[in-house]
């Protein structure tokens, strides 16, 4: 069995043949679904390479939005031994323990009171428990210290622009090398659910940068393209880690994109119905938040559409796997229902998603259809795990050879 270097980052793409990306959608409590799928993926990797390996050992970039940003941090934040603080199998227990406190449900008389007055006077939840928990969980870990490169989208409401936190940028722009806990709080601050999050960061030159953040889902609820763009930027900037990759060489990208499910296409809203809405109804209508539903769903689906077109055009559909389910019904489709029964149901839905047939987007209609090959998501994840394992072994072999050749060259010079 191979020994792991305690705090060494993964061998870069220049040592291999692929750029490997893991993307994790937002979705509130539905992040537990991604936890189920990631636990399965990590188990497949461990069967190939040993119990010591973790998901972060295999990806050049892990990107996450909102709840996906939290999972990204759990997978990549180092412990005292320089290894991932959490195994993927620990994500589900974490959600079961903490979601009921992050999203406390009203009980007794409070449960009977209308929710609208509360929403008009402030966010639905204070966010205090979330901030405290993330502070304890991630401590002083900075963005540049993650065990592989991470990309986490947020949106700054003061500048009205996305702020993309990237390990790559943190190395070149110290003002963006902030605490991972602050990033996670910011990317999870869904409007109407949690208050916007303010913090500042002072770099070594005394330059202070201010952040006024809300949920990254308003700009990129599915961060797949954001991650691909971050890598492309490094190629354009001639980052030596990227080797000889072409900026448009997406055929050399291997992408696993994990969704958190969405409501069944039940035509909940219509132009006729919405024509009568004012500001209040757009914010709250029959227990839903239409403006957020529309924003999150559109940013999620347009990314999958674009990614599907790109990989199909390059005849590389076999290197792009999207696991999601757009048939969730009732409580399962909510962002914040943290009851034990709903969380346990979401776990079952995650397990069901694994055995579902692989779905691909019809680029003409924009709808999901079964893939041409009769294969399930779990079988496809096994195939991707083998590719990831082979790529990692190749990189380590080439890196060892380069180190050996460099050592011989140094001895000859002496």
UniProtKB/Swiss-Prot annotation:
InterPro entries: Acyl_Trfase/lysoPLipase, PNPLA_dom. Residues 22-228 form the PNPLA domain. Disruption phenotype: Slight decrease in number of lateral roots. The lineage of its organism: Eukaryota, Viridiplantae, Streptophyta, Embryophyta, Tracheophyta. A motif (GXGXXG) lies at residues 26-31. Residues 393-414 are annotated as: Disordered. Keywords: Hydrolase, Lipid degradation, Lipid metabolism, Phosphoprotein, Plant defense. The nitrogen atoms of the two glycine residues in the GGXR motif define the oxyanion hole, and stabilize the oxyanion that forms during the nucleophilic attack by the catalytic serine during substrate cleavage. PROSITE patterns: PNPLA. Phosphorylated at Ser-399 by CPK3. Phosphorylation enhances PLP5 activity towards phosphatidylcholine. Residues 405-414 have a biased composition (Polar residues). A motif (GXSXG) lies at residues 64-68. A motif (DGA/G) lies at residues 215-217. Expressed in roots, cotyledons and leaves. Pfam families: Patatin. It comes from Arabidopsis thaliana (Mouse-ear cress). Possesses non-specific lipolytic acyl hydrolase (LAH) activity. Catalyzes the hydrolysis of the neutral lipids monogalactosyldiacylglycerol (MGDG), digalactosyldiacylglycerol (DGDG) and phosphatidylglycerol (PG), and less efficiently the polar lipids phosphatidylcholine (PC) and phosphatidylinositol (PI), but not the storage lipid triacylglycerol (TAG). May play a role in root development. The modification Phosphoserine is found at residue 399. One of its GO terms (biological process) is defense response. Its EC number is 3.1.1.-. Belongs to the patatin family. GO terms for molecular function: monoacylglycerol lipase activity; phospholipase activity. This is Patatin-like protein 5. The active site is at 66 (nucleophile), 215 (proton acceptor). Induction: By auxin.
């Amino acid at each position: 069995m191979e020994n792991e270097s305690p705090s060494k980052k993964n061998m870069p793409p220049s040592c291999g043949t692929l750029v490997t990306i893991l993307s994790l959608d937002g979705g509130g409590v539905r992040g537990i679904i991604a936890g189920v799928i990631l636990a399965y993926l990590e188990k497949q990797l461990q069967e190939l390479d040993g119990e010591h390996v973790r998901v972060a050992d295999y990806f050049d970039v892990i990107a996450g939005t909102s709840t996906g940003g939290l999972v990204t941090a759990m997978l990549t934040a180092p412990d005292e031994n320089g290894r991932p603080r959490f195994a993927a199998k620990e994500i589900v227990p974490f959600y079961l323990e903490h979601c009921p406190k992050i999203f406390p449900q009203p009980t007794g008389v409070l449960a009977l009171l209308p929710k609208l007055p509360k929403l008009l006077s402030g966010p639905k939840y204070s966010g205090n428990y979330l901030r405290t928990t993330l502070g304890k969980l991630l401590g002083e870990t900075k963005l540049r210290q993650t065990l592989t490169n991470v990309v986490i989208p947020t949106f700054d409401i003061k500048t009205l622009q996305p702020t993309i936190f990237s390990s790559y940028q943190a190395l070149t722009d110290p003002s963006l090398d902030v605490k991972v806990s602050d990033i996670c709080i910011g990317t999870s601050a869904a409007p109407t659910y949690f208050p916007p999050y303010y913090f500042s960061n002072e770099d070594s030159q005394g330059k202070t940068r201010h952040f006024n953040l809300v949920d990254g889902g308003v700009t990129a609820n599915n961060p797949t393209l954001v991650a691909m763009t971050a890598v492309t930027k490094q190629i354009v900037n001639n980052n030596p880690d990227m080797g000889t990759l072409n900026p448009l060489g997406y055929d050399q990208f291997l992408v696993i994109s994990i969704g958190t499910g969405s409501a069944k296409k039940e035509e909940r809203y219509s132009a006729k119905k919405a024509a009568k809405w004012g500001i209040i109804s757009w914010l709250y209508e029959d227990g839903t938040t239409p403006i957020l539903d529309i924003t999150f769903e559109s940013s999620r689906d347009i990314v999958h559409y674009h990614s599907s077109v790109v990989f199909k055009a390059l005849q590389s559909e076999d290197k792009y796997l999207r696991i999601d389910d757009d048939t969730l019904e009732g409580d399962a489709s909510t962002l914040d229902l943290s009851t034990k029964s709903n969380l346990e149901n979401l776990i079952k839905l995650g397990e069901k998603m694994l055995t579902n047939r692989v779905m691909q987007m019809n680029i003409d209609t924009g709808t999901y259809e079964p893939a041409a090959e009769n294969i399930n998501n779990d079988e496809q994840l096994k195939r991707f795990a083998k590719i990831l394992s082979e790529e990692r072994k190749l990189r380590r072999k080439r890196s060892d050879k380069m180190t050996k050749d460099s050592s011989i060259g140094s001895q000859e010079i002496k």
